[in-house]
Structures are given as C-alpha cells and as structure tokens.
Amino acid sequence: MNTSILAILFLIQCVFTLGLHFHPLDPLTPQEINKTSFIVKKSHLGNLKDLTFHYLDLEEPNKSHVLQWLSPNPSKKPPPPRRRSFVVVRAGGQTYELIIDLTTSKIASSRIYTGHGFPSFTFIELFKASKLPLTYPPFKKSILDRSLNISEVSCIPFTVGWYGETTTRRELKASCFYRDGSVNVFTRPIEGITVTIDVDSMQVIKYSDRFRKPIPDKEGNDFRTKHRPFPFFCNVSDTGFKILGNRVKWANWKFHVGFTARAGVTISTASVLDPRTKRFRRVMYRGHVSETFVPYMDPTYEWYYRTFMDIGEFGFGRSAVNLQPLIDCPQNAAFLDGHVAGPDGTAQKMTNVMCVFEKNGYGASFRHTEINVPGQVITSGEAEISLVVRMVATLGNYDYIVDWEFKKNGAIRVGVDLTGVLEVKATSYTSNDQITENVYGTLVAKNTIAVNHDHYLTYYLDLDVDGNGNSLVKAKLKTVRVTEVNKTSSRRKSYWTVVKETAKTEADGRVRLGSDPVELLIVNPNKKTKIGNTVGYRLIPEHLQATSLLTDDDYPELRAGYTKYPVWVTAYDRSERWAGGFYSDRSRGDDGLAVWSSRNREIENKDIVMWYNVGFHHIPYQEDFPVMPTLHGGFTLRPSNFFDNDPLIG
C-alpha cells in the first residue's frame, strides 16, 4: 500500500478514536501496531536478515502533558500528546531500538543497543527451541537408551541467567519430560539431560546426559478436577460500572485500564470522588506488575540456572490466558481483549485476557450497633461491594491470578494468587525415610522431589496522592514509659506513641518490614484536611513479605537486587518502570531498581514512585501436588487522612 494512503487512513482512524473516549495512555491499537511495523520494515532494517519484533508498545508520553490534557478545565487543555511507539527488534545478530512518530509516519530516533542483556524471547523462538532436541541425534540416542518413545517426549526451554561470563549470547536450556499419556507434563521429568541452545542460530551448542533416575509414575498426577465446578456467582445482579473505551467508571472511582505484552494489565490515572467537594482527586498515575523473580534453590548442574525473571524474559501480558467465564470470572463480568505485536510485527488479538466485575465480599464495609440510646437498639451498615479488574498469566508451570480491587472506602486492594503445578525433579527415593542427603526440596510423591524456590512479584506504583508533590512518611510505634508526672493520675507503666519520620532521599526509601512496628504512608505535604492533617494513603501488607536470602555476591542476586527490600521509594523517571532493567534476559545487574535507588536522589515533596515486592519463600508440601491450591498474597493502599471523614457516609 502506498505510504501516503496509509498515512491518510491512519489519520482518519486517529480522528475517529479521539472522538470515542480517547485517553493518552491508551494501548496501541491494531492499526497503530501494524503501522509501526510497516514503517520499520520500510526502513533500512527491512533489508537485514531475520528481522524480528521483540517489543512494540506505546512510547510513554510526558506525564505533565497527560495530566494537563486530562484537566477538567477546558481552557487549560492542550492538544493530546503525539502518539508514538517504542520498538525493539533483532536483526543480523544486533538489537535495535526505535521510536516511531505515528502522526508523521517517520522514525523519530533509532540506535543499536550495545549494553548487557537481551530482549524477551518470542513465542516462535520458544516453540522452535522446544522442538530442536527431538531432532538432535545424541538426544534421540539418550531417549532410545532409556527405552522411551520419543513421540511422547516434550521439551521445555528455560532461560539461563548470568553467572559471570564476560561475553554472552542468547541461550536457552531445554529440559525434557515424558508424557506417556499424562497431561501434567511437569510431573514426569527425564532427569540428567540438559540441552543448551543458541537461539539466534537455533542450534544445539552443548549437550549433557549425566545420569538417569526413574521417571515418576503418571498415576495420580492428573490436575484436572473430578468434580463438577460450581458456577462462579457474585450475587450482584447489575454490572454497576461503565467501560468507555479504556476508561472505567464505578461508584466513586474512575480509572484507565490497559494491556501490554510485557506488563499485562495496567491501571492508570485512578481518581476517587470526594463526597464533600464532589470532585475527583488523584490517587495513582500508573500501576502494574513490573517484574517477577523465581529462583530455585537447587545448586546442582541441572538446576542452578533456574532463576527466572518472567516479565522481562517472556512477558506477563504475552503469557496471559483466555479467561473462562464462571471459572476465572463471574457471570456479571465484562471481558476485555488485548492486542500485542507478533514476531513479524503484525497485531495479534488476545481475546478475553481481562475481566471487570463487581464483587460481593460477603461482609460489611462498615457496621455498628448502638445500645446506649435509651429505649432503642440502632444498627446501621453497608454490604461490602467492590470492583475487580483481573487477569491470569500462565508462565510455564505456574499460574498467576492478578487482581486490582477498588473499594468504596477509597482503598485499592492489589492481590495475586499463585497456583499451577510444581516444578519437580525425579529421584530414586520413594519414602522420606530413605533420604540421607540434601535434596533441596520435599518428596511430594514417589520418585518426585519438588524443589524449594521463591516467588517475587514487584509492583510499580506511581502514586500521585492529591497531586505530584508526595513524600514517604514512616509512622513508627514507640514504647514510652509513664513519667513521674503522670503517675499521680495513672496506674499505667507504659504506652505506645507514634513518631513520624519523613524520608529525605532514596536511601531512606528502602524499607524492611517486620522487625519494628511501622506504618508507611505516601502523603502530600502540600494538602491538608479541614482540621489540619496531612492527606495521604498508607500501605497495608497482607502478610509478612519474604525478602531474598541469597548472598549479595550470588549472581542471581546481582541481577535481582530489588528483592532485598520489600519496599522501595524512588524519584519518578519516565524511563524507570522495569525493576530488573529493560533487558532482563542475561542481565548483569547494571540496570534496574537497585541501581536507580543507589543514586540517592531526593524524594521529599517530589514526584515519587513506590515499589512493593509481594514475596513468598515456597517450601513445597504434599498438598501442593499434583496441582497447587491457590496461595494468596497482596497489599492494600488505604486512604489515611485523605478524606475529612468516612467516605462511605458522605
């Protein structure tokens, strides 16, 4: 198609879109994705060998421009930010970064990336790598020597991390499994074989077959339920919410929901209605899962490298699954699609990857019974109804159910449920009584050891509490002895009081939880309630969060230093969104949250970002096999002196 005709068609599409609930942070449309790839392919890169698209997303517009455009004052509203896309492609063994101006149909910038690390793998690369061992003669011989049928073998490629190599290439290591009629592939490993693959050349570059172990029995490992599933009801007859484009309105909330190949669901420009002023007030500019880290605790040759950073290496959104009505989401849910770029740059539709629904919490959002009014018993309350935005990502053996839940009291509850199947290794042991060595896990079935591991989900939370100028306040609870002065009127010997400390720099913004009682608040020191309290939101963890137990000099820890603290607060920078660095695969720890925080920038009364790690140390148990019941984690962002009184009362 002629470039000028394409530009005209795109302009028409943009004008149409702007008239239908446009938002500057809307994900790229299929037309914008295809236009981007068309421009890249028509450039000098189109002539290079094996041009492959690894990242194609909206180039984040300037935050101040977005906020001005969203201003309710028409006289201050500038033109919408220009739509631009950011692209990462591989061609001829090199990584290229481009910014495409979708209005002018021109490349605004282009450079070759020469730093450490590589972009995420495409599903085509992963598929080819999974099939490669099956055609490799030494592997075929190993399977034959084990008297196995190669048609029943499945291989799964894993990322390899970084372990001090001075030069690296794009590699995967494939582990293989023997189905033999079983659908629970991960429970039947063919132990002892490791296949190392050069992804760019798609060739086996190293092969080892070190030992053999009996393959675990397939009997009893089926994860499919034998019970008829109960329908998923919420007892909320009406939807109660409106979705206008990517904008969602419900009760006293309005926000923008998006979907990207890397982060999956994103929540932006979330504002809550003040019942006194009848105006919406800002709470969060941007929120999404930034990175995951799943290191396994087996240092042996076949396992040591399994330290996955799934979002940067594979993509949370790209791994999102089609949500199943009445299983993943209730009958009153609205389902939303996402669009991502395929390896060839063309738009791919991902159907029903998000759902939005009202949830009945089967409890009270508030209640009270008063018996001290003469002759009366007065009871009042309100049922807990909230709004949930949900997605599910399946990354290999694990499924992550991610919820953003908005409450009428002004709180945002962020939850993640871990489920799926364990990653196991084969063993000759059939009883725990036989084990006399460190097996780095738990015997969960005969010949089956589930390996110890961690899960960390790092959330990016660009909170704008009533504006951009925010601070981190640590409200520390301190025990105080009753003084001699008070002893004349009190029999008490002690009490606790609150001592508030405001973090000055990013070093102060690195916080460990659990040792001393403290509440963490993001406040706006420039805004106060009618009676003079500083407005804010506080962080409420749902359980004691795990932090990394790896030593600082261990290579996985160098790459994932952001897991050393559950809470980080940094100065806002538009380019700092991915906790493990943008190029996670084979990264060396020279980019990412820990590096940014080490700059020790000022964070008092600044535009700041909170990062929160939902962390688990997972010691496997037999009840986790053959499929793991959901394990919940999360946190709540709750208004704290943000309103003049309880917003549920008004």
Swiss-Prot record:
Q: What class of enzyme is it?
A: oxidoreductase
Q: Which GO terms describe its biological process?
A: amine metabolic process; jasmonic acid mediated signaling pathway; protoxylem development; regulation of programmed cell death; response to jasmonic acid
Q: Which residues form the active site?
A: D310 (proton acceptor), Y398 (schiff-base intermediate with substrate)
Q: How is it modified after translation?
A: Topaquinone (TPQ) is generated by copper-dependent autoxidation of a specific tyrosyl residue.
- What PANTHER family would the database entry show? COPPER AMINE OXIDASE, PRIMARY AMINE OXIDASE 1
- Report what the protein is called: Primary amine oxidase 1
Its induction note reads: Induced by jasmonic acid (MeJA) in vascular tissues, especially at the transition and elongation zones.
